[in-house]
Curated annotation (Swiss-Prot):
Active-site residue numbers: 98, 123
Protein encoded by which gene: clpP
Species this protein is from: Anoxybacillus flavithermus (strain DSM 21510 / WK1)
EC number(s) given by UniProt: 3.4.21.92
Protein name: ATP-dependent Clp protease proteolytic subunit
Pfam families referenced in this protein's UniProt entry, alphabetically: CLP_protease
GO aspect biological process, one term: protein quality control for misfolded or incompletely synthesized proteins
Length: 196
């Protein structure tokens, strides 16, 4: 059962009921709280574009609690974050794994955060394919290309040499918030909301 809380707001014109995500969007907060697929990516991209059009000078906060997901869907979010004018601040709540960690590190420099008990995990892309040998070869080349592209971007966003990224993403690599800060995935560990 998917229950989305409703918030009642008192205004000079009376009461207004919002679902919680719409109310947070009013404060330029976007929640990525699920595996990343095309539907989730379209929703996040739409919210980013809407907020950028509404006020191109004001930061957007993207809260991430995601196990990761589709590379192409995640890259749609990543490209939009880079494309729009407002800075996108990223905040890990719970877990940012795989593509979730990639998006966390892609936030505006100096504005990438995690809460103290967050967990961040990086690894190489996963994929599976079946079919004729030629199809398998094409798919293998594509996933190696994607791995190299993701590693290069992660290297740029963390300041880690590409060789370190390649080694550290060879297997699931779990980090505490503090370790993610040392690694360069985030800039600060937050304990209170007013620290941002």
């Amino acid at each position: 059962m998917n229950l989305i809380p409703t918030v009642i707001e008192q205004t000079s014109r009376g009461e207004r009921a919002y679902d919680i995500y719409s109310r947070l969007l009013k404060d330029r907060i976007i929640i990525l709280g699920s595996p990343i697929d095309d539907h989730v990516a379209n929703s996040i991209v739409s919210q980013l574009l809407f907020l950028a059009a509404e006020d191109p000078e004001k930061d957007i906060s993207l809260y991430i609690n995601s196990p990761g997901g589709s590379i192409t869907a995640g890259m749609a979010i990543y490209d939009t974050m880079q494309f729009i004018k407002p800075d996108v601040s990223t905040i890990c709540i719970g877990m940012a794994a795989s593509m979730g960690a990639f998006l966390l590190a892609a936030g505006a420099k100096g504005k990438r955060f995690a809460l103290p008990n967050s967990e961040i995990m990086i690894h190489q892309p996963l994929g599976g394919v079946q079919g004729q040998a030629t199809e398998i070869e094409i798919a293998a080349k594509r996933i190696l290309f994607l791995r190299d592209k993701l590693n290069r971007i992660l290297s740029e966003n963390t300041g880690q040499p590409i060789e370190v990224i390649e080694r550290d993403t060879d297997r699931d690599n779990f980090m505490t918030a503090e370790k993610a800060k040392e690694y360069g995935l985030i800039d600060r560990v937050l304990t209170r909301v007013d620290e941002k």
